[in-house]
Amino acid sequence: IAGYIITREYTDDTMKNISTIPISYRQLLSGKLLVLLLLTICFSFIGCVIALAINIIAGFSGVHFGNLFNLFIRVIGANIGIYISVLPIILLFCCSANNFLGGVALAFLYGYFGSFVGKLLNYYPIKASMILVDSACDAKYGVIYQISPACITIVLTFLISMIILA
């Protein structure tokens, strides 16, 4: 979705029309990234509502406000962290008309490697976003993650994104 939204001006050849508006490309891109963040939050919320509906329809026990609120916070928090983790890839590949597909492939691989288990993954941005919402996510495999390296990783990834955007 990010590549599609960001490259519309190039693929539809509307950049010349937009350039008459007194905003810089950086401001336009920042606005689109904000829309993508809001879409991330909305899709996270919709996913939680669907999960809630399935739980109620299936009659699973343990569906109460405390669990639901915890689910919503964790899912939305993890997805915002994943958004921040993928942001440098989005920014690096968004500047040309048809190059965003390479960014999609790279982001897929980048996310895939986040599914592995290991202590070094405290420093892997995709896994770090999940560690921030549940540091015991792989305790059953004997791996205990730490929140502070994960937090540092997410902050550094965000700072790298802001440097690329500047």
Model-derived features with residue positions:
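Transmembrane helix-boundary elements of multi-pass transport/secretion proteins
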Residues: I1-D12, V117-L121
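Terminal transmembrane helical anchor/hairpin motif
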Residues: V104-A166
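Hydrophobic alpha-helical segments typical of transmembrane helices
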Residues: A2, D13-M15, P88, P125-A128
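Transmembrane helix-loop junctions in multipass membrane proteins, especially transporters and channels
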Residues: L52-H64, N98-G102, Y123, K127, ...
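Helix-loop-helix units of permease transmembrane domains in multi-pass membrane transporters
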Residues: I5-L37
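Secretory targeting signals
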Residues: I1, S30-C95, Y141-V143
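Functionally important transmembrane alpha-helices
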Residues: I84-S115
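Transmembrane alpha-helix boundary and packing residues in multipass membrane permease domains
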Residues: Y4, C48, L52, I90-L91, ...
